[in-house]
Amino acid sequence: RAVRARATMSRTIWNVLNPNATAGGALTFASSLADANFVIGATGGDWQFQLKFSSGSMSCNMCWNVNERKENQIDLSLVTVDASNDINGIAMNDPVSGVADLALIKRLNQWKGGNYLTSGNQYPPLVISSERLMRLIVAEDALANGNVAAFEAQIDAIRALDGEVEFNSGGAVSDTAMLMHTRRMNLVLMGLRLGDMYRWGITDPMWHSASDAILTPGHMLPITIVEIRANCNLNGQGCAG
């Protein structure tokens, strides 16, 4: 049910992005709520549904590309790196406490095998769904329906998992800004960021001005030109013969 809640949430976001992505605030997730609430009630303890890897089974190609080959990197708005592109600090602060975000640190520690300052390997778990995601679904739906108290309660339940100070609605950080930040920090490396960027009108300074991401926001197949040219389903030449 946790995976289904993620899938129906993603479908709701997809429907907002297509045919044209428009910036907005919180969304209602009516098709996801029952599953999300069930998982929250049935789990706890910062539960995650993971794909696990090991030297005795199989490796994670994405993990290898980030941790070892470094073909892909953690965004530099989140971390700082040294001359070898190894993480040497946290760039993203929590908007309430003003110090390095604890949810981000916890996820990066997991990703690097215990300590985000180490190089890591090709075997960290991939998080497919989690208690945090379920609470984010419930929180956003509550905010979209004007139930600020329920939104705040879910956000603070997530923050409590890391020992963060409580968020108080109506303060210096707006509810929407808190939602956006909490999703970003708690869904790192889950493949959900691009949809959030599109629906909230966020762009990356690395995106080329003539890219599909800029010209036609909503594109969800961000692969390299080499891969496009090699794929007969994408290169415009067809697959016949």
Predicted feature residues:
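Hydrophobic-face positions in mid-chain alpha helices that act as interaction patches
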Residues: 9-16, 20-135, 164-166, 174-178, ...
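A short, structured loop/turn motif at beta-sheet edges
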Residues: 146-148, 172
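Active/binding-pocket-proximal capping segment
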Residues: 150-161
